């Protein structure tokens, strides 16, 4: 189980990303459309002035059952250990053990 403070930090980051998503997208669109280097520099400074945690790349995928940050399967939102346990128990519909 991951530390509760780390899970809380990730939840906080998700909220901040949602709050600044529209502003960040507008600035990025303006940055891409700008041709003048000075104008691009000014827009880049505005993007840098946004909070660091407002960037979507700062969010870490975590297992929803244990909070572990590594080995998380996107399709299920579970870490590899939980995926294996729940698949063996039959709690994941459509998941079967492979055999060939």
UniProtKB/Swiss-Prot annotation:
This protein's UniProt keywords: Ribonucleoprotein, Ribosomal protein, RNA-binding, rRNA-binding
Q: Does the keyword Metal-binding apply?
A: no
Gene Ontology molecular functions: rRNA binding; structural constituent of ribosome
One Pfam family this sequence matches:
Ribosomal_S14
> What GO terms fall under cellular component here?
cytoplasm; small ribosomal subunit
GO BP terms: namely: translation
Q: Which InterPro entries match?
A: Ribosomal_uS14 (IPR001209), Ribosomal_uS14_bac/plastid (IPR023036), Ribosomal_uS14_CS (IPR018271)
Keyword Ribosomal protein annotated: yes
The protein's job, in short, is: Binds 16S rRNA, required for the assembly of 30S particles and may also be responsible for determining the conformation of the 16S rRNA at the A site.
Q: How does it assemble?
A: Part of the 30S ribosomal subunit. Contacts proteins S3 and S10.
Q: Which family does it belong to?
A: Belongs to the universal ribosomal protein uS14 family.
Official protein name in the record: Small ribosomal subunit protein uS14
| Source organism per UniProt | Prochlorococcus marinus (strain MIT 9303)
Q: Which gene encodes it?
A: rpsN
């Amino acid at each position: 189980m991951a530390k509760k403070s780390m899970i809380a930090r990730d939840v906080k980051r998700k909220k901040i990303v949602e709050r600044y998503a529209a502003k960040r997208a507008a600035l990025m669109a303006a940055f891409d459309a700008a041709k003048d280097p000075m104008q691009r520099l000014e827009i880049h400074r505005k993007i840098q002035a946004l909070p660091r945690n407002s960037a979507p790349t700062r969010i870490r995928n975590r297992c929803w059952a244990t909070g572990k940050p590594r080995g998380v399967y996107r399709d299920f939102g579970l870490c590899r250990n939980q995926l294996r346990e729940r698949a063996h128990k039959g709690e994941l519909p459509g998941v079967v053990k492979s055999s060939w």
